[in-house]
């Protein structure tokens, strides 16, 4: 199902598009061969991001969640060094839009321990590592990126929840 690709293009497989209870799920797969391609993918997505967009990053330790966030930051014209928020819970960066980079693994689903609404409904983009742990505290519209280790590369499974997330995913994959 792959086509001949130029360097830097990503294979893409459409899985499904369904509507259920006014929630849209739109899933796609991509594969990046190395860290540079993962950052480039993040940068492309970062260019598409708008105020109040929410991204959920899932994947085991070392899968590339913070690496992908480095690319997102480049796409948002952020020139600061991007670090994992594992121990600080939240890191904020300034660029074209503010980037709120959260790691909620250590709060064990206790969204009240941080002012989650401040980030979700603030003036920027919110990226949440381990965001699936927040369960019902997640907004209704977000793009989840599941990052899976595949040898030296990464398989990225996109799960779009809501209309804006579908728009982001379609914008990201146009022409791929």
Regions found by a protein language model. Give the residues of each.
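Positively charged N-terminal leader segments that act as targeting/secretion signals
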Residues: 3-15
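N-terminal pre-Walker A segment at the start of P-loop NTPase domains
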Residues: 27-42
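Walker A (P-loop) phosphate-binding loop of P-loop NTPases
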Residues: 62
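Conserved lysine of the Walker
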Residues: 65
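Short phosphate-coordinating micro-motif centered on Lys-Gly-acidic
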Residues: 74, 118-176
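Short beta-strand-centered segment that lines the nucleotide-binding/catalytic pocket of NTP-utilizing
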Residues: 78-93
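Conserved nucleotide-sensing/catalytic segment adjacent to the nucleotide-binding pocket
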Residues: 92-132
């Amino acid at each position: 199902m792959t086509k001949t690709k130029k360097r830097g293009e990503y294979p893409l497989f459409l899985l499904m598009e369904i509507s259920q209870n006014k929630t849209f799920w739109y899933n796609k797969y991509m594969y990046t061969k190395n860290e540079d391609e993962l950052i480039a993918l993040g940068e492309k997505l970062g260019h598409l991001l708008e105020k109040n967009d929410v991204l959920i990053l899932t994947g085991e330790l070392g899968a590339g969640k913070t690496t992908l966030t480095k690319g997102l930051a480049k796409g948002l014209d952020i020139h600061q060094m991007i670090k994992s928020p594992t121990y600080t819970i939240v890191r904020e960066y300034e660029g074209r839009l503010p980037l709120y980079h959260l790691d909620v693994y250590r709060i064990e689903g206790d969204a009240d321990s941080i002012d989650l609404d401040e980030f979700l409904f603030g003036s920027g983009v919110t990226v949440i590592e381990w965001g699936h742990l927040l369960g019902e505290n997640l907004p209704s519209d977000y793009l989840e990126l599941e990052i899976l280790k595949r040898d030296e590369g990464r398989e990225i499974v996109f799960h779009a929840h809501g209309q804006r997330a579908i728009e982001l995913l379609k914008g990201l994959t146009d022409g791929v």
